């Protein structure tokens, strides 16, 4: 039996989310059908609002409602340090620990030759531009401890070091293959404190 078109379209939409297959999408679709109308409307409005009201900061690439973002506008931040992360969710994770007071730069991905992702496909050019424009003394590379994250860190290090800027990498507490997003605040704090030059 085929599902009615509205259900089929909803299932298809859910399947566009990462990690959501046919079964989970179907379950979510039927859960959505069972929702109160006001909850379904609020859910739909939240989806539309995220796409309409959020954009990427023109300086650091983080998600924001205003441009530049709140962090880039904050005059109390240490402008001599930029912490480079893969995704905006990593900025959120780092901010939870409330210890790091420098700036950020979001790459929106990592180098991955297997997937055809090269330097021009992620937010590297604007990072290099920032290093020439700003008074940056240190770049902390906080890519995930995966093969692609390590390759991206090494690539960035080779690009940045000739400019005389110290390049460090997060250290203690983050195991190989782990994502920053899932680390707790104490682990992240130890990783920032124990960073090493690369």
From Swiss-Prot:
Function as written in the Swiss-Prot or TrEMBL entry: May play a role in DNA repair. It seems to be involved in an RecBC-independent recombinational process of DNA repair. It may act with RecF and RecO.
PANTHER family: RECOMBINATION PROTEIN RECR (PTHR30446:SF0)
Domain Toprim: 80-175
Zinc finger feature spans (C4-type): 57-72
Protein's recorded name: Recombination protein RecR
Gene3D superfamilies (alphabetical): 3.30.60.80, 3.40.1360.10, 6.10.250.240, RecR Domain 1
Keywords: DNA damage, DNA recombination, DNA repair, Metal-binding, Zinc, Zinc-finger
One Pfam family cited in the UniProt record for this chain: Toprim_4
Source organism: Enterococcus faecalis (strain ATCC 700802 / V583)
Native organism taxonomy: Bacteria, Bacillati, Bacillota, Bacilli, Lactobacillales
InterPro entries to which the protein is assigned, alphabetical: DNA_Rcmb_RecR, Rcmb_RecR, Rcmb_RecR_Znf, TOPRIM_dom, TOPRIM_RecR
């Amino acid at each position: 039996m085929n599902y009615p078109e509205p259900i089929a379209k909803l299932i298809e939409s859910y399947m566009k989310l990462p990690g959501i297959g046919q079964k989970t999408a179907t379950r979510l679709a039927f859960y959505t059908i069972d929702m109160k109308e006001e909850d379904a409307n609020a859910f739909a409005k939240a989806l539309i609002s995220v796409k309409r009201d959020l954009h990427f900061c023109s300086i650091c690439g983080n998600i924001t409602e205003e441009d530049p973002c709140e962090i880039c506008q904050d005059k109390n931040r240490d402008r001599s340090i930029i912490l480079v992360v893969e995704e905006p969710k990593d900025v959120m994770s780092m901010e939870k620990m409330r210890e790091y007071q420098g700036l950020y730069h979001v790459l929106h991905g990592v180098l991955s030759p297997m997937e055809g992702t090269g330097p021009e496909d992620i937010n590297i050019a604007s990072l290099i531009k920032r290093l020439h424009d700003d008074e940056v003394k240190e770049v902390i590379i906080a890519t995930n401890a995966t093969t692609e994250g390590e390759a991206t860190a090494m690539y960035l290090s080779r690009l940045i070091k000739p400019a005389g800027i110290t390049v460090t990498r997060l250290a203690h507490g983050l195991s190989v293959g782990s994502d920053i997003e899932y680390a707790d605040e104490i682990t992240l704090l130890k990783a920032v404190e124990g960073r090493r030059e690369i």
